[in-house]
A protein has these predicted regions:
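Short, conserved loop/helix-junction motifs that constitute active-site signature segments
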Residues: 24
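Aromatic/basic micro-patches that form nucleic-acid/chromatin recognition or nuclease catalytic surfaces
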Residues: 39-114
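A short beta-strand micro-motif
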Residues: 4-9
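Short N-terminal binding/cap micro-motifs at the start of the first secondary-structure element
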Residues: 13-17
Length: 114
């Protein structure tokens, strides 16, 4: 399994419903999302880059907003949860992208600041 991180820029404060997690305010600034793909990492990343998709994962709801853009993508061989734990940032939404987390990360989305 390969993992990846998306460096995300939120260009204005947004109020957004994230699936069953609920409604949240995403403040302007930079975020990092850590994810993984069992089979085809490139297809997963390609899906994240598309604005036309069925909203399935928590990250889909954020990336689908016009005020949000992916700034950088980093691929890694490090296990998703270990990579996430090594990443600085503030957890703002508990459970975001971490429903299958094995290391109790709390969230796979971290706020890096403005």
């Amino acid at each position: 399994m390969q993992s990846y991180q998306l460096l995300i820029k939120v260009n204005k404060d947004i109020d957004l419903k994230v699936g069953k997690l609920g409604r949240f305010i995403f403040s302007i600034g930079s975020y990092v999302y850590t994810g993984s793909a069992k089979k085809n990492l490139d297809k997963r990343i390609e899906r994240h880059l598309s604005k036309k998709k069925k909203l399935h994962w928590h990250i889909d709801y954020l990336l689908n907003n016009d005020a949000v853009q992916i700034i950088d993508i980093k691929k890694s061989e490090i296990i998703e949860c270990i990579l996430n734990k090594k990443t600085n940032g503030t957890i703002i939404i508990k459970g975001f992208g971490s429903s299958d987390c094995n290391l109790c990360c709390g969230s796979h989305l971290k706020y890096l600041g403005n």
